[in-house]
Each structure stands twice: as structure tokens, then as C-alpha cells.
Design a protein with these regions (language model features):
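Enrichment for repetitive, rod-forming helical segments
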Residues: 9-10, 19, 35, 350, ...
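Positively charged, amphipathic and often flexible ligand-engagement surfaces
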Residues: 50-361
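Helicase P-loop NTPase motor core of nucleic-acid translocases
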Residues: 43-45
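Cationic, low-complexity basic patches in intrinsically disordered or flexible, solvent-exposed regions
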Residues: 3-4, 8-16, 20, 49
């Protein structure tokens, strides 16, 4: 397949305050942002010893993930880069390819994600697709054990669903030629139905079957019905808990209910004979999965556990040593802030790690 002509251009950002006409505003904004980050990190550290209501802290972090001033400071500063480096494999294609090769050497598969969402023009969508075409070429040329994960809003879904479909279809076609796979990421609940419909349309082409899949979030009430539909169409699924802020009318508000639904959905997926991914760092969910496949006689190579880059590396290695397949989701790029904040929101250990390191020189 011919590589997209759209070249990947790394965004070269400057520290806030470099534009003379905005010096005063930027200085105030920068100082306020630093104070805000320091305050959040302090709250996280204190909460480790004197627990606060976790849903409140989670909601705060998700709200901050949408704060433009914090995002601008974080993505353009050395401090932000240092904070994100645990979970984000650099900003360039070459950096993420090196990270993927390193993970592969440990016997672990990878899924590569060029960070970004909600593009504002068809040109931005084409540029984002161009990055993925470069990744697919490199995966084939370097014989990496890797696939790619793509958000439809990055392909132009907000602008024109037909544009997003065209961009995604070109990537799946390329993945077929490269003998790999495209995972369509799930975003907020506003996009759930459109995402499932588009994956169904992509999978309906005979040549694409087995080369495109989707993500289902266990915290949504609708997920069992969605899984039943997708299984009937033979579509591969990544099951995760979900990391976006959703109302109680759409999603289970309590972790215990999310966990119960996760186990229920896992038990629906794994006997289907389709290769699925169980995406969790929760040892209780992992142990429930291990017990279930043992009871049902499901071989360890009939599914995979999936985890995030930089999270529970010890557990990744343990699962591989025990004979299970593991895939690590590796994000990269300059637009890392929303992803990073959602990772802090969903897992206390991530928050504590970052908060402690924020105050270290």
C-alpha cells in the first residue's frame, strides 16, 4: 500500500512567556498554573495518608484534563515532559518505535497510539492519519510485534463522519497489507454509538475481518448489549473499565459495580472463540480472569492481557512468565496532557508516583 503523502511534523512548542505581547498575561498564567499543579500534587500525597473521597479527586483530575491553561503549560514545559515521561514514550515516531522494540524484547506485544483527539480541520485529520501510515510501514519493515490504536475524533469525526470513515478505512486497508491490526479506541459516551457503528461498517468488508476491533468500557450500562452485537459480527474487543467522566444515568458510579460488570463482560467475551484483550491493572480482575479461563479450559494464547506503558511493569513480566500473552499500550506525541490526566484519575498508584516525583529535583 502506498504510504500517505502527509508528512508528520513534530510540534515545536515554546515555554509560556516567550511572546512579548503576552508576557504579563503569560507570566500570571504560568505562576497560577504552577501553583495549581503544586496544590493538586499536595492533595494527592496527603490523601495517601488521610484518604479523601476518591470519586471527588477523580472528578477533579478529569476536570483539570480539560483545562486549557494547564494543558498549555504542561505540554510546553520541561516540567510537564518530566512528569509525563513515565507514561508517554516521547514525542516522535522514532521514539515510540524504539520503545516498542524494547518492550518486544521482553516478550510483550504493543499497541502504538499517536496522541491527539478532536481535530479542527480536515488537514489535521489527514496529518494524524499520515502518522499512523508511517507507523504501519515501520511495524512491517522492522517486524515489530505491534498494532495501532486510533481515536475517531482524531480522524475528523466531529467535522464529518464520512471523513473519519475514509481515514480509518485507509488505515485498516494498510494494516491488512502489513499483516497487523487497527484498534478503534472508545472515547466519551457521546461517541459510543457512532464508534460501534463505524467499526461494524469497517469489519463488514471481508478483507478487513480480523484486522479491525474496538474498545468496550465496563462502566457503561449499555456495554453488555454492545458486546452481544459485536460478538455476533465476529469483532475483536478490548475490554477496559473506562476513564471518562460519565453521569450516573449512563454509567455505574461505584467501583464495586464497575468491577462486577467487568467480570461479567469478561466471562461473555472469552468463551466466544474470538481473540480479545482484557485491559486492566487491577489484580482482582486479573485473578478473576485467570480463574475463569482455567475453569473453562480456555488456553492462555486465546486472549491477551493489556496494560499501559509505564504501569505495573512487574505484573506484566509475571503474566508473561506464567505463559499469558500481554500487550502494552504505548502512547506518544506532543498532545499528551488529556491522556496523562485520565491515567492519574483512574489509578491511585499513578497519582502517588507522579505527586512524589513532582517535588523531587
Amino acid at each position: 500500500m502506498q504510504q500517505s503523502s502527509v508528512e508528520f511534523t513534530e510540534y515545536q512548542s515554546n515555554e509560556l512567556g516567550n511572546e512579548p505581547e503576552n508576557d504579563l498575561w503569560n507570566l500570571r498564567d504560568l505562576n497560577a498554573t504552577r501553583i495549581c499543579i503544586s496544590l493538586v500534587c499536595s492533595i494527592i500525597i496527603v490523601s495517601e495518608h488521610c484518604p479523601v473521597h476518591m470519586p471527588i479527586l477523580r472528578s477533579l483530575l478529569i476536570a483539570l484534563s480539560r483545562n486549557s491553561s494547564l494543558r498549555r503549560f504542561a505540554e510546553s514545559s520541561t516540567l510537564g515532559g518530566r512528569m509525563s515521561s513515565r507514561f508517554v514514550a516521547g514525542t516522535s515516531v522514532e521514539e515510540v518505535l524504539k520503545a516498542a522494540a524494547s518492550v518486544n524484547r521482553q516478550g510483550i506485544s504493543t499497541s502504538l497510539d499517536s496522541l491527539g483527539e478532536n481535530v479542527h480541520s480536515p488537514q489535521e485529520a489527514q496529518q494524524a492519519a499520515g502518522v499512523y501510515h508511517r507507523l504501519l510501514d515501520a511495524i512491517q519493515q522492522r517486524q515489530l510485534d505491534a498494532n495501532v490504536s486510533v481515536k475517531l475524533t482524531q480522524m475528523g469525526m466531529d467535522l464529518d463522519p464520512e471523513l473519519a470513515y475514509a481515514m480509518a478505512a485507509s488505515l485498516v486497508e494498510h494494516a491488512v497489507a502489513a499483516n497487523t491490526f487497527v484498534r478503534i479506541d472508545m472515547e466519551g459516551s457521546d461517541y459510543t454509538q457512532a464508534t460501534i457503528d463505524m467499526v461494524s461498517k469497517l469489519n463488514a468488508l471481508n478483507a478487513n475481518r480480523g484486522h479491525v476491533g474496538v474498545v468496550i468500557q465496563a462502566y457503561l450500562y449499555r456495554s453488555k448489549a454492545d458486546i452481544d452485537r459485536l460478538l455476533a459480527e465476529g469483532i475483536r474487543i478490548r475490554l477496559c473499565k473506562g476513564a471518562y467522566q460519565e453521569p450516573a444515568s449512563l454509567a455505574f458510579p461505584e467501583k464495586a459495580d464497575v468491577d462486577r460488570n467487568f467480570v461479567r463482560l469478561m466471562q461473555t467475551l472469552l468463551p466466544s472463540g474470538i481473540y480479545h484483550g482484557i485491559a486492566t491493572h487491577d489484580e482482582k480482575m486479573i485473578e478473576a480472569t485467570r480463574r475463569f479461563v482455567k475453569e473453562r479450559g480456555i488456553a492462555p494464547d486465546q486472549f491477551e492481557f493489556q496494560m499501559l506503558y509505564g504501569v505495573r511493569r512487574d505484573l506484566q513480566k509475571t503474566l508473561v512468565a506464567d505463559g499469558y500473552r500481554v500487550r502494552v499500550y504505548i502512547p506518544f506525541g506532543t498532545e499528551w496532557y488529556p491522556y496523562f490526566m485520565r491515567r492519574l484519575a483512574e489509578r491511585p498508584a499513578n497519582r502517588i508516583f507522579i505527586a512524589r516525583n513532582f517535588f523531587r529535583q
